[in-house]
Amino acid sequence: MAERGGDGGESERFNPGELRMAQQQALRFRGPAPPPNAVMRGPPPLMRPPPPFGMMRGPPPPPRPPFGRPPFDPNMPPMPPPGGIPPPMGPPHLQRPPFMPPPMSSMPPPPGMMFPPGMPPVTAPGTPALPPTEEIWVENKTPDGKVYYYNARTRESAWTKPDGVKVIQQSELTPMLAAQAQVQAQAQAQAQAQAQAQAQAQAQAQAQAQAQAQAQAQAQAQAQAQAQAQAQAQAQAQAQAQVQAQVQAQVQAQAVGASTPTTSSPAPAVSTSTSSSTPSSTTSTTTTATSVAQTVSTPTTQDQTPSSAVSVATPTVSVSTPAPTATPVQTVPQPHPQTLPPAVPHSVPQPTTAIPAFPPVMVPPFRVPLPGMPIPLPGVAMMQIVSCPYVKTVATTKTGVLPGMAPPIVPMIHPQVAIAASPATLAGATAVSEWTEYKTADGKTYYYNNRTLESTWEKPQELKEKEKLEEKIKEPIKEPSEEPLPMETEEEDPKEEPIKEIKEEPKEEEMTEEEKAAQKAKPVATAPIPGTPWCVVWTGDERVFFYNPTTRLSMWDRPDDLIGRADVDKIIQEPPHKKGMEELKKLRHPTPTMLSIQKWQFSMSAIKEEQELMEEINEDEPVKAKKRKRDDNKDIDSEKEAAMEAEIKAARERAIVPLEARMKQFKDMLLERGVSAFSTWEKELHKIVFDPRYLLLNPKERKQVFDQYVKTRAEEERREKKNKIMQAKEDFKKMMEEAKFNPRATFSEFAAKHAKDSRFKAIEKMKDREALFNEFVAAARKKEKEDSKTRGEKIKSDFFELLSNHHLDSQSRWSKVKDKVESDPRYKAVDSSSMREDLFKQYIEKIAKNLDSEKEKELERQARIEASLREREREVQKARSEQTKEIDREREQHKREEAIQNFKALLSDMVRSSDVSWSDTRRTLRKDHRWESGSLLEREEKEKLFNEHIEALTKKKREHFRQLLDETSAITLTSTWKEVKKIIKEDPRCIKFSSSDRKKQREFEEYIRDKYITAKADFRTLLKETKFITYRSKKLIQESDQHLKDVEKILQNDKRYLVLDCVPEERRKLIVAYVDDLDRRGPPPPPTASEPTRRSTK
């Protein structure tokens, strides 16, 4: 840190609190140095590198049911950074608006978001607390009326009423807390008196600590002087004389110019040193022969966890550590607050009054971590508090930061940072650099600012100037040493580049006005209000608002529950962050004796550093460059290994969790982080890269899910924006309706009156507001005009109704009617008498018109009636004529059918032979009287009926003749007509068939032919029915005729075989042909086989 002028700068480096702490440790621990501890405190917050990619503290845990905590996976490794992308512009916990958690539908905070084990919420200084031995639960309600219960001390909440505890109402807490406020005020007064007594005791112990420090420093200087080589003694003596002269001049200049602040004064002479050793050896801090220091060792017991190494110039606390991988960083010890209990194993010390309790999702002052985040307390091994009933100790990285933790901007307790300057910084007296150079996985170089937390690809101007200064310093000492380097016990400084002092003013100039305003508007401190779910929050611009973690509600005005409470006023008047700063300022004012001691210590430490500078100049520069390069490569390799380890771990988890669930969680992360749908992947990456859900998908799947999210979210954002605009317009219209202003008012008058209304401000553009106003005014004027018109019509209709009640006619006079109706309110509703008379005349005219129109309507009605009657008559006549025609048609049809029946009866009686003709028969039929009954029939119809009668007679005779032939058993298939004629000629059926013998013969031959065809078909059927004949029959017949005889013997039992006895040759041909056909077909298919015609063609 830069000196702020004279003694004030020295007092910052060494204050009474530090000496007091060193003295207490010296009195407490009288044994050797404690055993080494690999877990050590990291460098100061401003000297830490940027957080690795993919590692962040994470968002607040999601809502969980009461009394539940999520499982913790101790095997979860730190998430590695993605390759090729610099760190984001700010820590993850500052990338969202403060105190703006997502809506939880008015639910109380789940217990999982309460403070972790070992860190109970405590009250702010001066606020009343509840009885520590009594567990009290408070019944409260959410805005929507749901009842829930919360612990008045731990803020733990539940939906169900707890058993076995005291439950009170919210209103009962106020008198209880008011009574306890007085008791606590007395306790505070006693605590202040004790603190003053302790301060006096510590001041007395400072002199003893200084004397011990001088004795130890002299002993170490003598031991080191004897170990130095004789060849280097003269060179070091000469260099020491030169350095002492320079240091004395600097000390005198500082003493003379104490009142003139400088920005380029040397850094405080507080250095860090490390030594290399095997895993079994230890690392200890050493000083040169001219340095004066006092070593105070802190032993540890078997039950205690070794604390981190802390070393200062005066007094120096030296701790031996094995730490093969961790580099011990020496810092000035901080005095523990009065209320800070000592550290015990497996616990994190928490102040009871110095650090207030905080609601979930709020950034506490001094970066008090939330559950799952490390607590960087000075002098205490870093531990990670997880959401389960145990504390896990986590090893720190080389930078002293826990894996996955972003560097905090403000330390919890302001430490006096001891910065070891390199030779270049001592020679140039430059400030600590804000920028640090890093490399991505693919080798690209980027630069990170430790203060503003921003990163850039281009090299900052500050680093360019620093490199130029280093080159100028190295120019006169570029002669390489050819002599072999002697073996040394101390390890060279592993720093990559000289560290400059911190410059405050240039950093402030780099920030823009908007960034400064945003920085000031962020919350810096908070204090809970006992007995209520509300907390008081202070911002950087000295503003105060109230936050309810139960309902996730923030408001500038004081809630109704807190109005009239004196303890709330006291909390607001005494901000905890300001009180802590005042106490820190008091500790920084030293006594005159201390200033003289500090000046002497500063001169001795400066001589030591100058001697180390001369030794380092004589060393081989190429060797240092190689070592620095190896260290850089080791850092890069370690980062790559961490990234690969995290990727492997994430790949294992991806193999367990289904892709759909991982994609859903990734989309939820994009939505929670406020990723814009109208931006690119590269611009939005810094919002999500530190979220643990970022590694749920591989790079390709992340890009695909992001593209899908952008497509869907873009439409949703447009819809939300449109709905928001519509809602704002509706609210603006509602505001104008509630205003009830005159429609003739101007927009300027309206805007001046309602400019402070939130609904007025919701419409961003003044042009849109004026357009909505003009539209509303136009609608109001139109409505007013319509109302006026409607009101006039109503008055007119009421006046006409009044006149109609008096049964006026066209002969009525206004002078007579006026006297009858002037007392009626409907008469008075008309404004003027002239308008009343005009309305009367209109009514009389209307009556006259109504009379004329009624007469016309009556005439028209009569004409319509007559026309309808005539039309009906025509329709009736038409229907009647159609019915008559139908009846006549049916009558004629009936007569025709009757005539046909009579004619057929006549033909049946008169025509008995089928050999007669129509011409001959017609003469005979004419003589019968029934001939006249068929007069309705035409000649062609009569002839047609005659031919049908003759065909029926012929068919009947033929059937009888064939029946005769069937009954004649002597007839065979080979019989002739001559043979048969002799047999049947005497039968009446043969005689009636026909008188022509040729006709009978032709009919007989046709009968024999039909019978022969039928006999052959029946015989084929018989062969198919005979199972004895198979496809093997032909082969058997060829071998022997006996098989054929057997077949014939079997067939002889059937009549169908015997019918063909007259043609045995033809019968045998049929048998042989059937056997050949079976042989050609071969074996029959199985019963389950389909027929060839039904087989599939596929």
Swiss-Prot record:
SUPFAM superfamilies found in the cross-reference section: FF domain, WW domain
Gene3D superfamilies: 2.20.70.10, FF domain
Keyword Transmembrane in annotation: no
Pfam families, alphabetized: FF (PF01846), WW (PF00397), WW_TCERG1 (PF23517)
Gene coding for it: TCERG1
Database matches in CDD domains: WW (cd00201)
Annotated compartments: Nucleus
Native source species: Homo sapiens (Human)
Low complexity bias (residue ranges): 259-333
The name this protein goes by in its record: Transcription elongation regulator 1
Assembly information from the UniProt record: Binds formin. Interacts (via the second WW domain) with TREX1 (via proline-rich region). Binds RNA polymerase II, HD and SF1.
Entry GO CC: nuclear speck; nucleoplasm; nucleus
Induction note: Up-regulated in brain tissue from patients with Huntington disease.
GO biological process: mRNA processing; negative regulation of transcription by RNA polymerase II; negative regulation of transcription elongation by RNA polymerase II; positive regulation of transcription by RNA polymerase II; positive regulation of transcription elongation by RNA polymerase II; RNA splicing
Keywords from the named record: Activator, Coiled coil, Isopeptide bond, Methylation, Nucleus, Phosphoprotein, Repeat, Repressor, Transcription, Transcription regulation, Ubl conjugation
Matches recorded under PROSITE patterns: FF (PS51676), WW_DOMAIN_1 (PS01159), WW_DOMAIN_2 (PS50020)
Organs and tissues of expression: Detected in brain neurons.
Molecular function terms from GO: identical protein binding; RNA binding; RNA polymerase binding; RNA polymerase II-specific DNA-binding transcription factor binding; transcription coactivator activity; transcription coregulator activity; transcription corepressor activity; transcription elongation factor activity
